[in-house]
Amino acid sequence: MLVSINWIRDYVDLDGCDIKELINKFTLATAEVEDIYYMGRDVQKVVVGEIKTLENHPESKKLHLLTVDIGDRVVNCVCGAPNVRVGQKVAFATAGGRVVAGEISKATVAGYESEGMCCSEKELGISDENSGIMELDPSYKNGTDIKELFPIDDIVFEVDNKSLTNRPDLWGHYGIAREFAALTGRELKPLDLADLDSDSENVVPVTIGDTEHVFRYSCLRMANITKHVSPMEIRIRLFYCGMRPINLLADLTNYIMLEIGQPTHAFDATKIDHIKVDMPKEDIDFTTLDGTTRKADTNTLLIYNHDEPVAIAGIMGGLDSEIVGDTSSVVLESANFDGICVRKSSSRLGLRTDASARYEKMLDPELTLVAIKRFVKLVKDIDSGAVIDSKLTDEYAKKYPQITLTFDKAYVDRYTGIEISNERIIHTLTLLGFGVDEKDGVFTVTVPSWRATKDVTIKADIIEEITRIYGYDNFEITTTRSPLKPVHSAPERLVGDEIKDILVKKYSMHEVHSYIWCDKKKYKKLGIEVEDNVKILNIENSDNGVLRDSMLPTLLVAAYENKDFADSYGIFEIGRVIEGTLENGYCNERRHLGVVLFSKSQSERDLYYKAIEVVNCIFEQIKHCAPKFAKIAPVHAWQHPKNTAAVLADGNEVGFVCALHPQNASKLDKTGSAVCIEMDIDKFSDAKAYDIEFKEPSTKQSTYYDLSLVLRKGVTYDELSENWKSMNIEELESVKLIDTYELLGTKSITLRFTFSSHDRTLEMEEVQGWIDEILHRLSAIGVSLRV
């Protein structure tokens, strides 16, 4: 939110204050300030000028040759504005001066000398209007500095909206001014409000059909409005605070919202004669002020004229009842709606506005009348002929209870840890608008309405109010005397960190960070469908409307988008997936590891065995055991129908290794290959971790024996290994896969057997005996020696 210091000065005397230091105090005490902008700093030596003569440029249809009276002299100027004319008063930037675009100097333009520039509002940085030069009041004296006429100089600071979530009173300048008053110890001036008394017998009838979500609805009709352009001061303030000036009535509703934080809405009075606030009985199409037709469902609060919807309550008005430049009578709405209802409607409709952002914070219902009185005051100040044309209608359906908190001085001392005098406590709370009564060291504090909606509710909140204004930087810093205890991380998080170390340090993989929702357009490029996944309600972008049930599609998209940057690489991520819903209806959220190995030079088979090696390494390093693999049918359509294997720990499935389905693989890359790993981190973390058994290395020479075996179709590695494991050969140190080979449907592998003894060097005859027995056992399952 953008805040104008000039606006704040309307309510707090800041003379003598260091504004930058004051803003810093505001950051420490109230809300974070993200940036400070010095408006008007770039505008220098811009004065009132009067066009004395005008000639068309002899060689240009757009340029004009002017003489301009700037008070102490008459200067020449070449100007291309379409609205320039003789006798016109303009904002003239003299040579040596500055505008937003830069310094102005004497120059020759199209062959003629120009000693300055006639400025548009955009060039002065006070609006986006750039269709012509700025026209000034004819009564302004030539040569008068433009800054003496308009509040161009200002300091605007930007407050982080997240800091204001629990402070609905700070969504307007008056609430910020109250904070500044408390920080400086100065008086907060009251708002200048109008009296709403009227001789008119007219009434704008209001019917509240939904009293649960409509807390208060106030409205009033005004007529005989003849002025339609806002004063420059109001337009500049709106522009500096991020609003686009439109017309007087629209500008004033925005002005009041920025001033006190209360949204208002002005309806064309010729189109409104009986207001009803309720939810529709069935879904309807409604066109809002931005020209977009939206579907309002039966949970959306609407404003009706009789039975015709004219606005979405708390969010935006309708196109058919909007005020235009020449509107002369309005019905002003100032209401208070349930913030949760407004937020949900805003989310469903995909429409978030400045008004809805404020209603979401649970505004003070007492502001509705303040806003109407302020609107009437401003309209009458600008247009003296405007009149109140109805009685005030004020339907107050639901009031917040008054909150009174009682505590003693000892409570303050205990929770602050310092001595703050009774006088300072009373003074601080009074400046913030709290009612305070103190008797015998016991304080009775009445919370003001603008802090009672969801902000200050318990005694500890009062302590916060006292200490933040006192200044946290005024507390004496002391070293903690409590014992320091180590932080215990969740086992699955520690396991995740260990896996990351293995993948990065041993296999040089790259970690990816992605969103849990699916980008359906990107998935579709790879032929991956996610329509059966858990869906997100009220999503603004329909392409991101489902949650992933596997880490791998996200990683495959990343591989697809980066396939041209490297020939071979591995990427991984540990993230959340949603595996359907539980019996209680909640999402079944799990933490999974996903790995994609991609290569344009290695075959799918080589990548598959590398994936097996990666899984083996993870198990050996963390669980100190080897995993088991079992062929399974694919769970996802993008998995290879044959080359998919479950990863087992203690007989329980904790993940899988798979190649891609040929159709998906061709869409990923026609010449490259990809193999995937996915593991449930939670299940893997819960699996048994075996003790590390130290086996002293043998001092004797090891004996290696390579066997090239021809496998029958369907034989698994587990079936092979069971044959030599059952022999319990103590001297068999390890068995490793060295190579694989396939030709004409026949598959062969090469295994390296390593034998070693601690007390002797093995004889070749002894080793050969074991090998012969292994071959004999393998022959029983259809495995033969390749010759």
Which role does the model predict for each range below?
Residues 1-197, 331, 350, 354, ...:
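Phosphate-backbone binding interfaces of nucleic-acid-interacting proteins
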Residues 5, 24, 64, 188-284, ...:
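Glycine/proline-enriched, intrinsically flexible loops and inter-domain linkers
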Residues 48-78, 253-320:
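Conserved mixed alpha/beta core segments that line enzyme active sites in large multi-domain catalysts
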Residues 113-123, 130-134, 151-155, 300-400, ...:
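Mobile "lid/hinge" segments at catalytic clefts and subdomain interfaces of large enzymes
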Residues 405-409, 413-569, 754-756, 766-787:
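Extended, well-folded interaction surfaces typified by the phenylalanyl-tRNA synthetase beta subunit core
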